[in-house]
């Protein structure tokens, strides 16, 4: 989310997908542009990868990122291996509002140290 926040508005044209937030599994759905789209980054609320892709490429989660930035790092690693990313219409509820706490800031610094941007 933070990657597409211009400070006053979310750049909807750069986003894809949908999700429910909160404790109610049938809550209000937030839409972020069309789904079934190619993407550069995916939110880690739900990531799916073919087993043969992992076996053939060595794609792995970096253990430096145990909660924050594991998803962004995983996606960038996948893209650096020439893999494609995309969204698909799957219904789920994310029961976390997220936070920008000290742990997030520490992981962000680690992410910047690895990727440089």
Tell where the protein language model's regions lie, with residue ranges:
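Short, flexible, basic/aromatic active-site loop/helix in glycosyltransferases
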Residues: 5-40, 52
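Active-site donor/metal-binding and catalytic loop motifs
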Residues: 83-106, 110
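Active-site rim elements
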Residues: 62-65, 97-99
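A structural signal for well-ordered alpha-helical scaffolds and beta->alpha junctions
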Residues: 7-8, 12, 42, 71, ...
């Amino acid at each position: 989310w933070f990657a597409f926040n211009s400070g006053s508005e979310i750049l909807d044209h750069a986003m894809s997908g949908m999700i429910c937030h909160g404790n109610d599994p049938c809550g209000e759905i937030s839409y972020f542009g069309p789904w079934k789209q190619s993407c550069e980054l995916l939110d880690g609320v739900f990531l799916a990868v073919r087993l043969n892709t992992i076996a053939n490429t060595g794609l792995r989660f970096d253990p430096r990122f145990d909660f924050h930035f594991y998803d962004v790092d995983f996606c960038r690693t996948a893209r650096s291996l020439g893999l494609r990313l995309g969204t698909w219409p799957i219904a789920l509820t994310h029961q976390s509002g997220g936070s920008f706490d000290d742990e997030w800031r520490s992981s962000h610094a680690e992410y910047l140290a690895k990727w440089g941007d």
